[in-house]
Amino acid sequence: MRKVAIYGKGGIGKSTTTQNTVAALAEMGKKVMVVGCDPKADSTRLLLGGLQQKTVLDTLREEGEEVELEDIIKGGYKNTRCTESGGPEPGVGCAGRGIITSVNLLEQLGAYDDEWELDYVFYDVLGDVVCGGFAMPIRDGKAEEIYIVCSGEMMAMYAANNICKGILKYADAGGVRLGGLICNSRQVENEKAMIEELARKIGTQMIHFVPRDNFVQRAEINRKTVIDYDPTHKQADEYRALAQKINDNKMFVIPKPLEIEELESLLIEFGIAN
């Protein structure tokens, strides 16, 4: 079972990218579980046809200790297994701790057991590595390969670099490695070349460039992944290509994060700061 975590700046399109990629892997015949690690609990909605599933933390609050695996995992597109960790009530508690509680409970209830014959588990993780809880999939070896969703926008690249610092910090302890950058295009000038260069400097690869297409939003409005909504659309082939590249990937590295000056000079070199 391959344990994958998807990180990236808030609003970059992590959940959309994760679900569309998982749909492509499921279409290939892979058995995949998605663990949403975001208090918004929107990491599995498209795989579940728009269903906002009840989160692990909400279930624990209502049911107490008497929780069964089927209470917190729902079957999604092509037999994907979907669960959402959820978060505390707004203004109370720590969302990072919620992830730790949820993943530990999933382990106790046997969600990762051999009987499920999982090929992949995907963790879709909120925003930047802002606190220890959100770093948990990296820190505790829950995830072994990380993909960072970014774009040619400055803050997305800044966040990607910060996430690399988190991977570097825990690489020895948890055995986690960076599998590559996924460029979710924002149609920034020289975007593809810039992210390829950022990846090279960090010591990794841009595993795929996902072009911007409003069809993704159309599929989302219809509560589906692109592959589910229209498997013949060209954007569906982009996610298939990304899924295939992840499936075939052999390049797993300990990243070399850039100093802020290096990052800024990269932006200047490609004309963003001009």
From Swiss-Prot:
Residues with the ADP-ribosylarginine modification: 97
GO biological process, one term: nitrogen fixation
PTM note: The reversible ADP-ribosylation of Arg-97 inactivates the nitrogenase reductase and regulates nitrogenase activity.
Record key words, sorted: 4Fe-4S, ADP-ribosylation, ATP-binding, Iron, Iron-sulfur, Metal-binding, Nitrogen fixation, Nucleotide-binding, Oxidoreductase
Family recorded in the similarity comment: Belongs to the NifH/BchL/ChlL family.
Organism this protein belongs to: Chlorobium phaeovibrioides (strain DSM 265 / 1930) (Prosthecochloris vibrioformis (strain DSM 265))
Pfam families on file: Fer4_NifH
Cytoplasm found in the keyword field: no
Binding site for [4Fe-4S] cluster: 94, 131
Protein name: Nitrogenase iron protein
Enzyme kind, highest EC tier: oxidoreductase
Molecular function GO labels: 4 iron, 4 sulfur cluster binding; ATP binding; metal ion binding; nitrogenase activity
Catalysed reactions listed for this entry: N2 + 8 reduced [2Fe-2S]-[ferredoxin] + 16 ATP + 16 H2O = H2 + 8 oxidized [2Fe-2S]-[ferredoxin] + 2 NH4(+) + 16 ADP + 16 phosphate + 6 H(+)
Assigned EC number: 1.18.6.1
InterPro entries according to UniProt: NifH/chlL_CS, NifH/frxC, Nitrogenase_Fe_NifH, P-loop_NTPase
Cofactor: [4Fe-4S] cluster
Gene3D superfamilies per record: P-loop containing nucleotide triphosphate hydrolases (3.40.50.300)
Annotated residues for binding of ATP: 8-15
Subunit relationships: Homodimer.
Function (record text): The key enzymatic reactions in nitrogen fixation are catalyzed by the nitrogenase complex, which has 2 components: the iron protein and the molybdenum-iron protein.
